[in-house]
Amino acid sequence: MAELAHQQSKRKRELDAEEAEASSTEGEEAGVGNGTSAPVRLPFSGFRVKKVLRESARDKIIFLHGKVNEASGDGDGEDAVVILEKTPFQVDQVAQLLKGSPELQLQFSNDVYSTYHLFPPRQLSDVKTTVVYPATEKHLQKYLRQDLHLVRETGSDYRNVTLPHLESQSLSIQWVYNILDKKAEADRIVFENPDPSDGFVLIPDLKWNQQQLDDLYLIAICHRRGIKSLRDLTAEHLPLLRNILREGQEAILRRYQVAADRLRVYLHYLPSYYHLHVHFTALGFEAPGAGVERAHLLAEVIDNLEQDPEHYQRRTLTFALRADDPLLALLQEAQRS
């Protein structure tokens, strides 16, 4: 169970420094971690806060670095990251709450306006908790707030700088293969096209609790291995991309009654992990990583490849990198020379 919780934390997609990542946000047991399992305990004992890595009053989220499993309290324990996030409201439960007599404390009153602190019952007071344990220095840096810098990556930059840098990193995506091979999260799969070349699985993103549709968020993960990102796509991949767009939209309509014109379907560049995947989010949801500097609408990707099969090998792409990302310095140096 501890291993499962650790692996799922690694893939929290878009809690990655935006994105898993994300993710974001890998498992060895199918059917665990989907909100239906029995109550469990955290996979460690104790949690001594060492540092607040990041917090956002707007997003109601905080990232904490702590020491756990300490024997003496002298720093001999292990590192862990705990992410606490207030969950979205569920309209039906809130309506029931307001019909009753909720516990209130008056904070302010003036004419027709008044402000209270309301203390909700247990079913409305849950806090989504993501655990990264044991946490490495890379995890700590990933969640630490950093300044961002825009870079423009040419096709040559990708081939000569970005790709060699990625290939030099130990970026495990075993958790992706576990999903595709049904070794983990098999009961969470909403739809599958099993074709090994042009098929995919559609699965709810871990950032979505599946309790309401306002923040609907699913991920399509292609079965075909070796496609790292947008940069690898050519006309050869058009059947796969068309399948993901059409069949993904149809599956979401069947399961959640959300029509295609109410969905935002896009790829990230840079992605939070390097196995081709596509994001499906509710159009009105301000999903992490949906900004113009990172999101590429799938329909437009298809159009671009239809007109120029090597569009993404040639095109200059703009994206943001954290100040501490080694790739930023590599690209800046290459562009100066």
From Swiss-Prot:
Query: What is the residue range of the motif nuclear localization signal (NLS)?
Result: 10-13
List the GO biological process terms.
deadenylation-dependent decapping of nuclear-transcribed mRNA; mRNA cis splicing, via spliceosome
User: Which positions carry N6-acetyllysine?
Assistant: K138, K142
Q: Which residues carry this modification: Phosphoserine?
A: S24, S101
Where in the cell is the protein located? Answer: Cytoplasm; Nucleus
Q: What InterPro entries does the entry give? A: DcpS/DCS2, Histidine_triad_CS, HIT-like_sf, Scavenger_mRNA_decap_enz_N
Question: Could you say how this protein's activity is regulated?
Answer: The hydrolytic product 7-methylguanosine diphosphate (m7GDP) efficiently inhibits the decapping scavenger activity and acts as a competitive inhibitor in vitro. Inhibited by 2,4-diaminoquinazoline.
Q: Where is the composition biased (Acidic residues)?
A: 16-29
Region annotated Disordered, chain positions: 1-37
Pfam families this protein is in?
Answer: DcpS, DcpS_C
Its biological purpose is as follows:
Decapping scavenger enzyme that catalyzes the cleavage of a residual cap structure following the degradation of mRNAs by 3'->5' exosome-mediated mRNA decay pathway. Hydrolyzes cap analog structures like 7-methylguanosine nucleoside triphosphate (m7GpppG) with up to 10 nucleotide substrates (small capped oligoribonucleotides) and specifically releases 5'-phosphorylated RNA fragments and 7-methylguanosine monophosphate (m7GMP). Cleaves cap analog structures like tri-methyl guanosine nucleoside triphosphate (m3(2,2,7)GpppG) with very poor efficiency.
Q: What is the protein's name according to its record?
A: m7GpppX diphosphatase
- Species whose genome carries this gene: Bos taurus
